[in-house]
Amino acid sequence: CPLRSCHLPFTLFIRTFATAMTIHKDCIKTILWIWIIAGGLIYLLLRFVPWSFVSYPLSAIFVFIMGFSVFFFRVPDRKVVKGDNVVTSVADGEIVVIEKVFEPEHLGKECIQVSVYMDFFNVHVNFWPITGECTYYKYHPGKYLLAFLPKASELNEHTSIGIRNEYGEILFKQLAGTFARRIVCYAEPGKAAVKGNQCGIIKFGSRIDMYLPLDADIKVKLGDCVKACET
């Protein structure tokens, strides 16, 4: 079978469902288009290209893309850290910024900025970091610079979301990047935010900036790999 060597995508597909993962609802259409296009190309390769040393490897690549697309837009089952005064990471990724900054847009005061960079292989779904009330939401059009650059926080397309509970208020931003040009956000001022529930997704990676009170006890350091809901 020409596709026998391409068992990895199907393994990823099976693992996605076997480990209580689901597919993000806003990505189903994207996955379907990937499968339609890749499936069509595989058919054309196997039907009309007579050289197996060309058609088989290329078909294998497209099968891998089909399988990986399902794994790529997965929604993992996470054990949420409890405590209304405990802020968890909005996204999976690497800590790239921990510094004191002035947040002028909504909080209007000095905060601790903690930024999480999501690469191509991280889970792309975002989760509410605390339970409380959504107090602020704004979409900012912008550029698509590399997300790990410091100036990307202000210049790139992003959304800003504020949440408040009895312990205080925080703000976080979903930043688009060079490849991640599709931000989905479910925030709506006045609505409840529940820690661990989905608050959106940034397709194809990018970055999250979180703005925390100066007296927050930061439990991570630069270079740490974090998981949404659990870190």
Q: Model-found features: residue ranges?
A:
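Short hydrophobic targeting helices and cationic amphipathic motifs
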Residues: H7-L8
